[in-house]
């Protein structure tokens, strides 16, 4: 099938779009969307006790919110052996995040919180947050590649930490609020955001090496942003929780012992049926023998 030239996407247009997207400044608009959604997650995790907790324990509430807002930088610095407190060196970011924290928890009639929960507003915030997520993953991989140019695993770990650090730091954030749930952490039950960041960081690490992936960086970055935005909107609008689940189930069934476990269960069930059949035959013969004697 021949596609008309009017419908063909020029590669230069895609590269220019990727370059423009890559050069977007995150401060303040994209940072506002990120801070707002992170602090809303803290409030949602508190549930109905959010209002009482924020008034009784404002310091704990503020600290847990800041941990979520800057979790990516905390975790990446920890992995690279850099000062963990470094995210607090920019007072502009702290002031902006604190203002948003105050509006989410203390605005009259919960106005900011309720507005952010409206679906169109939530979609816009989600798109902006995913653009920032792609930006952080890209910069995390680039920073790690400068320090460890021959280590793909370090680049992927740092890129994932920059993009999905909030899920991993959540256990510490809950501990600050007096909640200890060690069985509910991102390493045991990784969210789709963490899995997507692993995939994106792996692609960017391969693209950085130039050995296995030779596509232009701006084009790769544009595809990653589209990947993040598409699945985030699918989760918000269509409630698609984890698109990777079918692939994971198939992979585990083939390579993680799923097939052999199923065969073992089938053999065990077959043995149980044979044993039950033999036992019923023995009971039938023992019952028929006394009847013959009575006759």
UniProtKB/Swiss-Prot annotation:
The keyword Ion transport applies. Residues 46-56, 108-119, 178-188, 240-295 are cytoplasmic. A 1,2-diacyl-sn-glycero-3-phospho-(1D-myo-inositol-4,5-bisphosphate) binds at residues 129, 133, 166. Changing residue 180 to A: Abolishes calcium-sensitivity. GO terms for cellular component: endoplasmic reticulum membrane. InterPro entries: TRIC_channel (IPR007866). It is found in: Endoplasmic reticulum membrane. Its main location: endoplasmic reticulum. Residues 274-295 are annotated as: Disordered. Pfam families: TRIC (PF05197). The chain crosses the membrane at residues 28-45, 57-80, 90-107, 120-148, 151-177, 189-210, 216-239. Keywords: Endoplasmic reticulum, Ion channel, Ion transport, Membrane, Potassium, Potassium channel, Potassium transport, Transmembrane, Transmembrane helix, Transport. Residues 1-27, 81-89, 149-150, 211-215 are lumenal. It is a multi-pass membrane protein. It comes from the Eukaryota. Disulfide bonds: none annotated. One of its GO terms (molecular function) is identical protein binding. Homotrimer; trimerization probably requires binding to phosphatidylinositol 4,5-bisphosphate (PIP2). Belongs to the TMEM38 family. Potassium channel that mediates transmembrane potassium transport. Might be required for maintenance of rapid intracellular calcium release. May act as a counter-ion channel that functions in synchronization with calcium release from intracellular stores. Binds phosphatidylinositol 4,5-bisphosphate (PIP2). This is Trimeric intracellular cation channel type 1B.1. It comes from Caenorhabditis elegans.
């Amino acid at each position: 099938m021949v596609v008309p030239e009017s419908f063909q996407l020029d590669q230069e247009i895609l590269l220019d779009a990727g370059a423009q997207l890559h050069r977007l400044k995150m401060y303040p608009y994209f940072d506002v969307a990120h801070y707002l959604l992170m602090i809303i997650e803290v409030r949602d995790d508190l549930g109905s006790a959010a209002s009482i907790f924020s008034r009784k324990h404002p310091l704990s509430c503020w600290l847990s919110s800041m941990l979520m807002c800057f979790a990516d930088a905390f975790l990446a610095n920890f992995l690279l052996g850099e000062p963990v407190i470094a995210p607090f060196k920019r007072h502009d970011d702290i002031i902006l995040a604190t203002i948003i924290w105050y509006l989410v928890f203390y605005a009259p009639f919960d106005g900011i919180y309720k507005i952010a929960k409206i679906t169109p507003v939530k979609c816009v915030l989600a798109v902006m947050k995913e653009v920032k997520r792609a930006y952080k993953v890209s910069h995390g991989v680039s920073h790690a590649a400068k320090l460890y140019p021959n280590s793909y695993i370090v680049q992927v770990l740092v890129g994932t930490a920059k993009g999905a650090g909030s899920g991993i730091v959540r256990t510490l954030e809950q501990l600050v609020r007096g909640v200890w749930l060690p069985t509910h952490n991102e390493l045991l039950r990784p969210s789709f955001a963490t899995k997507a960041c692993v995939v994106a960081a792996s692609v960017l690490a391969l693209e950085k090496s130039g050995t296995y992936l030779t596509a232009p960086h701006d084009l790769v970055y544009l595809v990653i942003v589209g990947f993040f935005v598409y699945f985030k909107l699918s989760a918000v609008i269509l409630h698609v929780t984890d698109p990777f689940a079918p692939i994971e189930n198939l992979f585990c069934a083939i390579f993680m012992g799923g097939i052999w476990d199923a065969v073992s269960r089938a053999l065990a069930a077959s043995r149980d049926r044979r044993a039950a059949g033999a036992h019923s035959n023995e009971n039938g013969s023992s019952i028929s023998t006394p009847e013959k004697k009575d006759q």
